[in-house]
Design a protein with these regions (language model features):
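Helix-centered, glycine/charged polyanion-binding patches within enzymatic domains
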Residues: 363, 368-440
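Electropositive, glycine- and tryptophan-enriched low-complexity nucleic-acid-binding patches
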Residues: 301, 309-356
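Basic, short loop/linker segments at the boundary and entry of helix-turn-helix/winged-helix-like folds
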Residues: 25-70, 74
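Charged, often Cys/His-bearing segments associated with DNA-binding zinc-finger transcription factors
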Residues: 1-43, 277, 282, 458-468
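Active-site- or DNA-interface-adjacent structural scaffold in DNA-acting proteins
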Residues: 99-301
């Protein structure tokens, strides 16, 4: 059975605190109290340990966990800022349900976010869309869809900087191993200073132009590759010696730490070797293809994506699809492991719209990247009356007349709102750059950002409905 959290409503200042809330908070408060949403969060938290429900101290109520995570993304705060702000703010304490209780610390809240996982977050989002439909916030008569890039939290990738990262990480791990195991087996030789000098040399030479400087650049890269190769070889010997118990500890906890450090070496060594391989291919063989390149040792799923932006020709992250209905409600989001073409996403987006809102949209609007004759025919076959997707390359006079009609121009005006929605979720809810780790973390980050935006927009729409 879930435990109820005491709130300010049980005290003497509930009315005064409620008057200080933002307008959307009052209606969002009722939406987030939905039993299906709270139960989904409760079940996810209960799975952290097989006996979480029956053993240990009482945990924080699921309602509070959900509201704290949503507030974090509504305000685009870190967990540390969330802890500080809620502790000192009566309105946030009231909205999140913390009330007069002790505020959970940042590390605890971070563990909650990991415990929920992308599946539960997706479930919460879909339930919010159903609530928006039931309350008349959105009916699903129109749909617009667009894609954007959410960047991973990495520095701008270059071959030299990635090798520098690899040497730094491998050396740091080997230093920890030496501190635990002592001076047995292979001795650590720290080449960090040598690599740093190589990186500075490459930076100076790379700024100059001309064939002579290109030859100098190859020489500098050859030296950096040689030094990096020596560090990788040393790391492999360290890993092998831990496996053969040459490097070991008599204390159980320290031995477990050594085994964990060996796993870190075994994870990082192949990544550094891949960076070396792609560096040789680019510098010495002129292969500049980006497909399959490793762009970060810490976020290996990162892709380089070109969306044709003049100011940012290359973006490093994952492709995300956002589709909306009326009142700026995001009905679906999707993070793609590999970038698809936009035209491959339209039919699936319409099917998702039908599944969530129980009807085909009367109008579908998207930009020209989503257009194809096949997509237009498939959309009409699914019940869409008006497909408002421009064909920029058409030579057909009939098609050009169709695209000049008032309904088509009005649909394209409404479509531009999807670009505004993307701008809002990036600026207000932090979807410009993902602060969570890995592909799973990207899904959680995008999902919570979308939920935060929907909660605010549902609250504002219900606030407008309540005005007599």
């Amino acid at each position: 059975m879930r435990r109820r959290q005491l709130s300010f409503a049980d005290g003497l200042i509930a009315e005064e605190v409620s008057d200080l809330r933002d307008g959307w908070m009052e209606h969002a408060d009722a939406v987030l109290a939905d039993e299906a949403i709270v139960s989904a969060v409760y079940e996810a938290l209960a799975k952290r340990h097989p006996k979480s429900r029956s053993r240990g101290r009482h945990g924080t109520p699921a309602e509070v966990v959900l509201r704290l995570l949503i507030l974090k993304h509504v305000r685009n705060w870190s967990y540390e800022v969330l802890e500080r702000e809620v502790r000192a703010n009566l309105v946030y304490r009231d909205f999140t349900g913390v009330g007069g209780a002790k505020m959970p610390d940042a590390k605890t809240m971070g563990r909650w976010g990991v415990a929920l996982g992308p599946e539960v977050i997706k479930q919460v989002h879909e339930r919010l869309v159903q609530i928006a439909r039931a309350k008349g916030v959105t009916a699903g008569r129109r749909m617009r869809v667009d894609t954007t890039v959410v960047e991973t939290d990495i520095h701008h990738p270059t071959d030299s900087s990635l090798m520098g990262d690899g040497v730094r990480v491998l050396t740091r791990i080997m230093r920890k191993i030496t501190q635990i195991a002592g001076a047995v087996g292979t001795k650590l030789r720290d080449r960090s200073r040598s690599v740093k000098l190589r990186l500075l040399e490459i930076g100076r030479v790379a700024r100059a132009k001309g064939p002579i400087n290109q030859e100098k650049l190859k020489q500098r890269y050859a030296r950096l590759l040689d030094t990096t190769s020596r560090v990788v070889g040393q790391a492999r010997r360290f890993s092998d010696e831990i496996g053969r118990r040459v490097k070991r500890s008599k204390e159980i906890l320290k031995q477990l730490a050594l085994d964990g450090l060996r796993q870190e070496l075994d994870l990082m060594i192949p990544r550094v070797r891949q960076v070396m391989k792609q560096t040789r291919a680019r510098i010495f063989r002129g292969n500049t293809r980006s497909e399959g390149k490793l762009l970060s040792l810490f976020e290996p799923s990162t892709e380089v994506i070109r969306k044709g932006k003049a100011g940012r020709p290359n973006e490093f992250g994952k492709m995300v699809k956002l589709q909306e209905a009326e009142n700026q409600i995001i009905t679906d989001y999707q993070v793609y492991a590999q970038r698809p073409h936009d035209s491959d996403l339209l039919v699936a987006a319409i099917e998702t719209h039908q599944a969530l809102l129980g009807r085909a949209p009367r109008l579908v609007a998207a930009d020209a990247a989503f257009y194809s004759l096949k997509n237009e025919a498939a959309a009409k076959a699914k019940g869409v009356k008006r497909v408002c997707i421009p064909n920029r390359s058409t030579r057909s006079a009939e098609r050009k007349r169709e695209q000049r009609k008032r309904w088509f121009r009005d649909g394209q005006k409404w479509r531009t709102g999807s670009e505004g929605r993307i701008s809002v979720v990036k600026r207000r809810h932090g979807l410009d750059r993902c602060r969570y780790k890995g592909y799973v973390g990207m899904n959680r980050w995008v999902g919570l950002g979308v939920i935060a935006d929907n909660v605010v927009n549902i609250g504002r729409a219900l606030e407008r409905q309540a005005i007599p």
